[in-house]
Structure formats: C-alpha cells, structure tokens
Amino acid sequence: SYEGQFNVVVCQNDNEAYGAMDAMDAAGITYGVDGDVTLISFDATHDGLQYTLDGKINCDVECNPIQAEVVAGVIQKMEAGEDYDKTTLVEDSAFVAPGIESEYATTMTDEILAGRAY
C-alpha cells in the first residue's frame, strides 16, 4: 500500500509524469486535484498542460524551449565579435490546475492552452 508512504510525485518531465500516471492508475492510486497524491511535472508541453487543465497534474513548470534560440543568438554575437549581454534570462512559467491557488503560478485555462506557441 502507498498510504503513508508517499503523497507527492515529482517528475522531471511530462513523459515521466505520464508514466507515473499509468503506474498509479494500474495500482488504483488516485492523483491530481481530487486525488490522494499530488503530481508535479516539468516541461509544460501541450499534453502536459492539458492534463493540468483536466486536474490530473497539479502543477506543470515550464522548461522554455525558446531558450535555444536565445542561446544561439548570443553565440552568433560572440562569434561575430559583437557586444552581448553577459547575463541573459529566459522566462519560464509555472501552471497549476483549476482550483489550486498560487501566487507563484498561473491557473491553466482553455484560453492559455490555446494561445501557447508550443
């Protein structure tokens, strides 16, 4: 029995979260907003955010894929001998399922999901 053994699962990416969901489903363990286990993931892929909107993933933290473009731009400036910022920050976001209040994360909605570029 998992009871008393764990109540949070943290996954390093959305695919890992899907595997954890499959394993918990097979074991009859409830998770998400209405479950016994809080499920946290990192990636914020479209599917991961859909599961967040559905209340299966409590929180999904973005690993912004646009950071590669930003880094490539800095490298190009360096190679060209141009000035570049010594520190470049790429903004990430965190999203929570409806019904969860957080000052650090945005509540996932249909509108937010539809407006995502990735």
Question: What role is predicted for each listed range?
Answer:
Residues D54-P65:
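Short beta-strand elements at the ligand-binding edges of bilobed clamshell
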Residues S1-Q50:
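Hydrophobic alpha-helical
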